């Protein structure tokens, strides 16, 4: 038996008239829909039961046969087959057209496919199809040319002169005749000959024609099928008609469009039967053509057909297009059952892997499970009574629910789901009330807060789904962020504040210098008020019992505070005792200075020492990362829960809060402002005397006020008390920063106006003093712009993510090693002298391509193909090695994906990447998710021309779309020396002297030079400041240079904003942009010149001819923007569901494309499991095998084996 859900590929093509008739179950002859009295479908109408099947299950139209027992009987009275009503979703009908009609997609699309096949202009085609001109179909022995257009007048004149020796016609029939006459093989050979000599426009046109003709020749589609003789009618359930309350009917627009076609078709038939004058018939044929056009794609040509209220009707094409179309609304975004949503509230007492589910919601979600359990426990006799029990919410239901829920994880999702941490699994616990309880530590990953956010719950049903949820998606498993491999579950806000307060030290606190035998005694003293949390005390080191203490240290006393003793209890046993916030203390051991001999004068020693800084958010993050590195997941999540509990407990005990008295206004503020004002007055004087320009005046005023604000900020921070609650909040990283504080107590500073230009009147007051009316008005500008920007940015960033996902969705780890011999040479990324990304950051988690040796000793630091761990990376960086050759996605040879070695470590787990990991989507999410944090504005540095560098989100879009950048830099095309810089008129020219030739470059007005005479320069390097156009760079250099440039630019933008992203994510995206080549010369292969091919397809075609000793093709690499690259993908399903649906489908149909279903989207669309992760073939072919007792050394009944 054929399995409908298991197929290997999907093919699309043109349908021949016979094919359309074979799909059909009958001809629709009347435009009627349903009878207004009986509300039953009219016979032969658009909803006819005889054609499309019965409206009610197992019941014919006239009611003679009812019930299942007549299954398959065709009623002898009404002719309706007795079957299920759902066949009305799949049975098609057809309309026999009285005159052929052109299909608007193939005639009107760009480029016009019909025009290319016939070598006629779209304008000429339009005149013929819509009956404005005649076209000569057979020239006979007249001086007329075939395909020549004739007006009505000319046609009559020629008819009179030549009689019937030539033939000319109008309408789609004429075009059909021309299409049937075409000899594809002859045309193709002719064009190939022409290509050898043609240049310019003729060559381009020939290439386009050749592509379309080859497509027809290879796909088995007939060109004449672009003209319709028969029109398919889609099943009635897909264009339903429903009765509204009030007796009126609502119907799909398609029914109106079909009715117009049928009406005009019937009228045309009648006119032809009557033998009406040709002008009337022609008019009717034109109207039929327009009706069919409107049905297929309303609005593509002329004015769209409108319904009531002047609303354009939705045609078949509109059903597919856009966010609400079939692809994105129903195929890629399905609604699921077993789901619910509710408001979230915090659940501080939950474990890391738990969430609280409201009782009513849980009962509804797990209803079938509860029903089954009720029957099994004998609490209900059958399923029906079990259901009744649940609906009446009888008390025994709750106990059963508890037991059902116990081992059954649920998925929680918060929209917008920007990265894979937006859906995680939890074990539910039942809670009262109607709100979902969420663990506070997972808020960062979800970007959730409790101000009314809602979340959705989903229940994984099958045992495989539950296992995946538990093993891969449980919140306790997702500790690292896939974008940079840093922990994403760092404590925030109250938790940070509590731990900060707990680890504070205070000089002269109560009980300073007391000595305790162990932590418990210190705790007892604290509880009884003898010491404070912040008191510096000594404890016997042996009682702390830390593995990292030496034998000698164990006999000494450890200097610490009561708070730190409490804090260290949450850490794993073999972890160093953390006494100061330094990396050496975290990674190695407690510094020796904290140990003193027994019998020493503790008080004196303590009094002579500085206070040690408390642990801020950053340190807590480092502790978590270090614990994760050493102890993996379970221990980390346990420690996180303890850290959370401590934080909440001690932030409550601390009672830290903000009062007006905590904000002290700086005394020296007035002096600073007076000074600044004097400077500004001076600048204005200079401007009035004409010594400086308006631009300079503006720049100087802005910089004077900015400096004044910085001075005030600096002094404020110095004058602050370390115990000031606001300072503690900002210093610990819980909330707020220096700038907030400056605005509260110093001055608000400069504000931007809505266009982004800075207003030169500063706000001199702080919030504590209160703003004047004018100052308040100015500050509303800035605030409003901030909100508007954020809203725009979110949409922009979401669209960027969508494009990124689309271009990389089929990049999956496919194999262990691709065996490439190429690598990528990397060093630190620098901008000037500032290191943007260090060599260490770039090395960790990658495989070395070549052996790395110590530059001085020559000792081998990393062997070839060895994984570079954190420790090795430190060693390499400290050894003074500048560049390392590593395996990279750029140079990976794997088709449709990457291999394990080239990708390196999976950042989300800290282990090797698994085969099947969908690294393309992870890369897209990692780049897209921080998009919202990037600034929106294009910086205008003082408004000097040529200095407009785009930054932030617009720059990222510019890079990934491979657009010409703003403020483009001029680059050198040759290696050489800057021979001279000449002034020509009001511009400059740079002369580069190479070994063979000299090149002169005109520098655009206002651009700033980056070079000086005598300087050496290599090809592809900038002569002026600004961004390089990557397409230009590709012409001058090679792929590697472009890859490195794009990677560097992306990292620059993100790192400047303080966002870290792993290189490998950018590499995956850039690789997708550079995977195509454009054929320049076809050689003796069968590829066409000028076409875009995948690099692998190109090498295959060449390998084939080289084996036969023929001439291979040549090609140039092409850089495509991500949108273009998505549309150029081999999968038409993926491209059609992305953008430009009609164009993609038109093209695919003519070429008779096969979609091999390699990517994720294609498989989601057709409803198969995605071929990534556990859905990969190699993991699907796993069987359960029962073994005999003899072979069993394990207790399990089954073992998994791979076929």
UniProtKB/Swiss-Prot annotation:
Catalysed reactions, semicolon-separated: RNA(n) + a ribonucleoside 5'-triphosphate = RNA(n+1) + diphosphate
Residues given in the record as Zn(2+) 1 binding sites: 60, 62, 75, 78
InterPro entries tied to this protein: DNA-dir_RpoC_beta_prime, DNA-dir_RpoC_beta_prime_bact, RNA_pol_asu, RNA_pol_N, RNA_pol_Rpb1_1, RNA_pol_Rpb1_3, RNA_pol_Rpb1_3_sf, RNA_pol_Rpb1_4
EC number(s) given by UniProt: 2.7.7.6
Binding-site residues, Mg(2+): 449, 451, 453
GO CC annotation: DNA-directed RNA polymerase complex
A molecular-function term among this protein's GO annotations: zinc ion binding
Gene Ontology biological-process entries: DNA-templated transcription
HAMAP family associated with the record: RNApol_bact_RpoC
Name of the protein this chain belongs to: DNA-directed RNA polymerase subunit beta'
Organism: Bacillus anthracis
Gene name, Swiss-Prot/TrEMBL: rpoC
């Amino acid at each position: 038996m054929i399995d409908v859900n298991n197929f290997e590929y999907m093919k699309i093509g043109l349908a021949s008239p016979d094919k359309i008739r074979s799909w059909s179950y009958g001809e629709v002859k009347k435009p009627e829909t349903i009878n207004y009295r009986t509300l039953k479908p009219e016979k032969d109408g658009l909803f006819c039961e005889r054609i499309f099947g019965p409206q009610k299950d197992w019941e014919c139209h006239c009611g003679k046969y009812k019930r299942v027992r007549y299954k398959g009987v065709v009623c002898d009275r009404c002719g309706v087959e007795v079957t299920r009503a759902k066949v009305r979703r799949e049975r098609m009908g057809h309309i026999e057209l009285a005159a052929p009609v052109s299909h608007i997609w193939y005639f009107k699309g760009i480029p016009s496919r019909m025009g290319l096949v016939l070598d006629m202009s779209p304008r000429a085609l339009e005149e013929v199809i819509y009956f404005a001109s005649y076209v000569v179909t057979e020239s006979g022995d007249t001086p007329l040319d075939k395909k020549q257009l004739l007006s009505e007048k000319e046609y009559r004149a020629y008819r009179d002169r030549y009689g019937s020796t030539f033939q000319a016609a109008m309408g789609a029939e004429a075009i059909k005749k021309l299409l049937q006459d075409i000899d594809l093989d002859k045309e193709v050979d002719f064009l190939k000959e022409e290509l050898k000599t043609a240049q310019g426009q003729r060559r381009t046109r020939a290439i386009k024609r050749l592509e379309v003709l080859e497509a027809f020749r290879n796909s088995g589609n007939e060109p004449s099928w672009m003209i319709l003789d028969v029109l398919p009618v889609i099943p009635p359930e897909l264009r339903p008609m429903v009765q509204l309350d009030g007796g009126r009917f609502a119907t799909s627009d398609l029914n109106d469009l079909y009715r117009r076609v049928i009406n005009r078709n019937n009228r045309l038939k009648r006119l032809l039967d009557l033998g009406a004058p040709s002008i009337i018939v022609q008019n009717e044929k034109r109207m039929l053509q327009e009706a069919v056009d409107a049905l297929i794609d309303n609005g593509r040509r002329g004015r769209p057909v409108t319904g009531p209220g002047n609303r354009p009707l939705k045609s078949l094409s509109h059903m597919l297009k856009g966010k609400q179309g079939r692809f994105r609304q129903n195929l890629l975004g399905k609604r699921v059952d077993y789901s619910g949503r509710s408001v979230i509230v915090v659940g501080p007492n939950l474990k890391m892997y738990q969430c609280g589910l409201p009782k009513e919601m849980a009962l509804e979600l797990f209803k079938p499970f509860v029903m089954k359990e009720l029957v099994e426990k004998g609490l209900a006799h059958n399923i029906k009574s079990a259901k009744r029990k649940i609906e009446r919410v009888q008390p025994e239901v709750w106990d059963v629910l508890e037991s059902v829920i116990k081992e059954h994880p649920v998925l929680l999702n918060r929209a917008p789901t920007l990265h894979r941490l937006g859906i995680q699994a939890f074990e539910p616990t039942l809670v009262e009330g109607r709100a979902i309880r969420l663990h506070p530590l997972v808020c960062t990953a979800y970007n959730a807060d409790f101000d009314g956010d809602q979340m959705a719950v989903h229940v994984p049903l099958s045992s495989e789904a539950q296992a995946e949820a538990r093993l891969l998606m449980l919140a306790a498993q997702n500790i690292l962020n896939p974008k940079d491999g840093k922990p994403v579950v760092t404590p925030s806000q109250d938790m940070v504040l509590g731990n900060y307060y707990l680890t504070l030290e205070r000089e002269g606190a109560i009980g300073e210098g007391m000595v305790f035998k162990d932590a418990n005694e210190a705790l007892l003293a604290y509880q009884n008020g003898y010491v404070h949390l912040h008191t510096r005390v000594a404890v016997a080191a042996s009682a702390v019992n830390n593995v990292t203490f030496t034998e000698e240290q164990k006999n000494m006393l450890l200097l610490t505070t009561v708070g730190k003793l409490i804090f260290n209890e949450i850490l794993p046993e073999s972890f160093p005792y953390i006494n100061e916030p330094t990396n050496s203390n975290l990674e190695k051991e407690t510094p020796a200075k904290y140990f003193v001999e027994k019998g020493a004068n503790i008080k004196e020693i303590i009094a002579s020492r500085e206070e040690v800084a408390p642990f801020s958010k950053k340190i807590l993050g480092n502790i978590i990362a270090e614990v994760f590195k050493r102890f993996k997941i379970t221990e980390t999540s346990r420690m996180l829960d303890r850290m959370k509990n401590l934080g909440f407990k001690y932030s409550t005990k601390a009672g830290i809060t903000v009062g007006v008295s905590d904000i002290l206004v700086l005394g020296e503020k007035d002096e600073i402002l007076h000074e600044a004002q004097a400077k500004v007055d001076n600048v204005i004087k200079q401007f009035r005397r004409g010594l400086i320009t308006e631009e300079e005046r503006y720049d100087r005023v802005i910089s004077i006020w900015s400096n004044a604000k910085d001075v005030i900020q600096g002094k404020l921070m110095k004058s602050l008390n370390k115990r000031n609650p606001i300072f503690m909040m900002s210093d610990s990283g819980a909330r707020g920063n220096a700038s907030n504080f400056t605005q509260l107590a110093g001055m608000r500073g400069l504000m931007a106006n809505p266009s982004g230009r800075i207003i030169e009147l500063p706000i001199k007051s702080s919030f504590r003093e209160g703003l004047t009316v004018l100052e308040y008005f100015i500050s509303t500008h800035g605030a409003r712009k901030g909100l508007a920007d954020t809203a725009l940015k979110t949409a922009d960033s979401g669209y960027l993510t969508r494009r990124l996902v689309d271009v990389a969705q089929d990049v999956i780890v496919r194999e262990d090693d691709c065996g490439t011999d190429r690598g990528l040479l990397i060093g630190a990324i620098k901008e000037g002298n500032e290191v943007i990304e260090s060599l260490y950051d770039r090395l960790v988690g990658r495989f070395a391509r070549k052996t790395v040796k110590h530059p001085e000793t020559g000792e081998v630091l990393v062997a070839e193909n060895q994984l570079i761990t954190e420790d090795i990376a430190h060693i390499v960086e400290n050894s003074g090695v500048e560049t390392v050759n590593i395996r990279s996605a750029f140079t990976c040879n794997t088709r449709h994906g990457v291999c394990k070695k080239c990708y390196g470590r999976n950042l989300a787990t800290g282990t090797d990447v698994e085969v099947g990991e969908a690294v393309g989507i992870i890369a897209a999410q990692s780049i897209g998710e921080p998009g919202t944090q990037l600034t929106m504005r294009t910086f205008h540095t003082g408004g000097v021309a040529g200095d407009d560098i785009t930054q932030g989100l617009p720059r990222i879009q510019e890079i990934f779309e491979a657009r010409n950048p703003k403020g483009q830099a001029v680059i050198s095309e040759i290696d050489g020396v800057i021979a001279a810089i000449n002034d020509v008129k009001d511009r400059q020219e740079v002369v580069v002297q190479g070994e063979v030739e000299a090149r002169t470059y005109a520098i655009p007005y206002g651009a700033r030079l980056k070079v000086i005479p005598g300087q050496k320069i290599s090809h592809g390097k900038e002569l002026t400041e600004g961004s390089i156009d990557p397409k230009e760079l590709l012409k001058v250099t090679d792929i590697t240079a472009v890859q490195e440039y794009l990677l560097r630019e992306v990292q620059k933008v993100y790192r400047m904003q303080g966002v870290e992203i792993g290189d490998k994510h950018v590499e995956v995206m850039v690789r997708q942009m550079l995977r195509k080549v454009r054929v320049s010369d076809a050689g003796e292969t069968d590829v066409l010149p000028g076409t875009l091919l995948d690099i692998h397809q190109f090498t295959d075609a060449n390998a084939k001819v080289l084996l036969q000793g023929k001439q291979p093709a040549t090609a140039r690499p092409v850089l495509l923007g991500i949108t273009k690259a998505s549309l150029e993908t081999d999968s038409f399903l993926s491209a059609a569901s992305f953008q430009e649906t009609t164009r993609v489908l038109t093209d695919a149909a003519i070429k008779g494309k096969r979609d091999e279903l390699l990517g994720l989207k294609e498989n989601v669309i057709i409803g198969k499991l995605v071929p990534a992760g556990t859905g990969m073939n190699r993991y699907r072919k796993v069987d359960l095998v029962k073994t005999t007792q003899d072979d069993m050394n394990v207790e399990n009944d089954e073992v998994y084996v791979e076929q």
